[in-house]
Amino acid sequence: MWWSIVGLGGSCFVSSTDKRTALKGYQVWEEGECRAWCQHNSEKELAREALIYKHLGEHPHILHCYGLEEVHPGINSLRLEYAPFGDVRKFIREHKAAPLTKGVRLRMALDTALGLSHIHARRVQHCDMSCRNLFLFDNYRVKIGDFGGSLIEGQDELRGGVCEEAAYELPLRGREFWSRPARKRELFALGSAIYEIMAWASPYEGQEDGEIEKKYAKGEFPTLEGITASNIIQMCWDEKYGSADEVAEALRALIASQR
């Protein structure tokens, strides 16, 4: 793999040559040479993601996007803020034996809830909330990114195939797949993100997606015994919260009680 590539998604590379900004695109062009490419032309998807970032605007817990940049005639990439510690999931897996302090992890959870609150205030659905789309910065501050599958409410329809990963997906609970409330889906996923941060492991880590889906369908969730913020996580999973603001307030109260 080319040296500047720091991430790889389904149809895009993320590369950085200066460790200050990153380029997300389906071709990596450097010094007039195409160093890597995906077969799928992602111009439309990148333009949509740029539009979502512009719609969201500036926020301390949203990854900053500088817009589309032509890297070669007719070839565009997204210029993004560079996350020095990568995504939260990768960081957790690389530091499995040395978790961050409980206080730092609670603040990471709060950052995530505040970012999602802003996303919802701007009437955007992320549609793929997970720790692999949370990015870690200096002092372990978190910003939400990767809006490739997101939509603006009232302007877009949810596309088939766009959904959360198994451990982050709200069970049907007697509903049709597409009839689950969008906010409840995202708040359930927020609960799983908080779990992953506080437990320092993803829900049912290492198990197959199908097995996780079966357990969730039966109402079986990972044990929360001994995990800080267990009540908040459980309430997210039980659909007890009406907004990310409520989750953020609960986390603030918990942080204050720990002092």
Question: What kind of feature is each model-predicted range?
Answer:
Residues W2, W200-R259:
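Helical subdomain adjoining the active site within ATP-dependent kinase catalytic cores
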Residues H64-N76:
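Short beta-strand micro-motifs within the conserved protein kinase catalytic domain, predominantly
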Residues P73-D87:
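Conserved short submotifs of the Hanks-type protein kinase catalytic core
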Residues V88-L100:
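AlphaC helix of the protein kinase catalytic domain
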Residues L116, H120-F137:
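Catalytic-loop of the protein kinase fold
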Residues R132-R175:
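Activation segment/activation loop of eukaryotic-type protein kinase catalytic domains
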